[in-house]
Amino acid sequence: MRKLSVFYEHILQACEQSGKTIPEVLAFCREQGISAVEMNYSLFASEREVIAPMLSDAGLVISCMHETFDFSHDTDLGRAQQMLDTAASQQVSRVLFVAGALETAEAAELAACSSTYEATSTFMAENKSIQNMVHALSSLAEYAALRGVSITLEDFDGFLQPFARTYPLLWFMEHVPGLRYTLDIGNFAFSDEDVSYAAWLLKDYIVHVHCKDRAESPLVHGRFCRGLGQTPAGTGYLPMAKLLTDLEACDYDGYLAIEHFDCLLYTSPSPRDRQKSR
């Protein structure tokens, strides 16, 4: 049985789009077979006394907490440790860190060499910002493990982030003990990389999945990228059904997070109906 989650930000968007209250949209999600939400840590920390009871009343849990940090430059890990403590207190076993960014020139150099693992590894080992991230993530992974939490990176859709492409991600997984991977199906298109190959190469590290799809554009003719437009999960050009089947064949039993920012929740097929049709 697939476990479905949805981003809490989508819940808030659906309220704006439909005029319904947050509890009403949460109840709708539960009726559609969704059992959890993806939660931004800062939002939860600022509204915990409101959000936690609403989720409990709806029969929903938090599948993963996510937050942006600057481990490439900031050595203070206090806020990240607070996030891990909060996740543990809510029985959240996965957190996603957007862990930092490079300067534009550094990012361009990494992009130029990221087609091979050997060149990628040389760059990553010599870059100070990336080494700062490694030290921070290593410390936090150890801190998290003591609390029953796994920290993850995703294939981020940004040029400056050194975890946007396949080989840099593999390098991080191999150099940070305990680090795990959140597969975002839609984000390799940003770097014009093959999501199927990436999922295969990184399969042993995958503990969480974002089901983000992409809409085709007649103006985009990349090798793997045919557009970056938003579209409800399962309706775009990415091989989502096959990827999910392959994950299940590898005994993946984690959450599948529905991610489709700016797509109308109430005018799209339900997650349950979409699963039946694929």
Please report, for each region that a protein language model flagged, where it lies by residue.
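Active-site acidic/histidine proton-transfer and metal-coordination neighborhood
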Residues: 57, 61, 72-181
